[in-house]
Amino acid sequence: MSHPAYELPIDVNQIQALIPHRYPFLLIDRVIELDLEAKRIVGQKNVSINEPFFQGHFPTRPVMPGVLIIEALAQAGGVMTQLGLGRDALSKLFYMVKVDNARFNKQVVPGDVLILEVQMKRLIRNMGCYYGEAKVNGEIVASAEIMCAAARE
């Protein structure tokens, strides 16, 4: 399937046409930069006090779970991969299979705008490898190397 040339920003409705994630697990609100030739994407997640995970993490001092920041990076990588391959949300699913060198440098709290910068390192057959950095106000709050693999049918 070929995609129309997306104009930036790519909004949440267009994102949902590309990846299968939905509320409450859709963790990217928009794409603000995309360079398929350079295999680079920049997404945005507006972190709201209304996020379901804040009910228990932690009620008196809400902090976005680090694993969800990594998931948000993976979803940004997924959007880029789907666009690069000309696929949509109904295509074969990719699953996160490995995370290396995850670092969490600062807490992400309600009101933060999480910027998701992802670079694809390689795509070989059914596996994609990415490096991602999540930033708030230009400061790296988390980073990781992520590997995803297409589901077997």
From Swiss-Prot:
One of its GO terms (molecular function) is (3R)-hydroxyacyl-[acyl-carrier-protein] dehydratase activity. The keyword Cytoplasm applies. It catalyses: a (3R)-hydroxyacyl-[ACP] = a (2E)-enoyl-[ACP] + H2O. Signal peptide: none annotated. Keywords: Cytoplasm, Lipid A biosynthesis, Lipid biosynthesis, Lipid metabolism, Lyase. One of its GO terms (cellular component) is membrane. Its main location: cytoplasm. Gene3D superfamilies: Hotdog Thioesterase (3.10.129.10). InterPro entries: FabA_FabZ, FabZ, HotDog_dom_sf. The active site is at residue 57. The keyword Aminoacyl-tRNA synthetase does not apply. Its EC number is 4.2.1.59. GO terms for biological process: fatty acid biosynthetic process; lipid A biosynthetic process. It comes from the Bacteria. It is found in: Cytoplasm. Coiled coil: none annotated. Transmembrane segments: none annotated. Belongs to the thioester dehydratase family. FabZ subfamily. Involved in unsaturated fatty acids biosynthesis. Catalyzes the dehydration of short chain beta-hydroxyacyl-ACPs and long chain saturated and unsaturated beta-hydroxyacyl-ACPs. This is 3-hydroxyacyl-[acyl-carrier-protein] dehydratase FabZ. It comes from Xanthomonas oryzae pv. oryzae (strain KACC10331 / KXO85). The gene is fabZ.
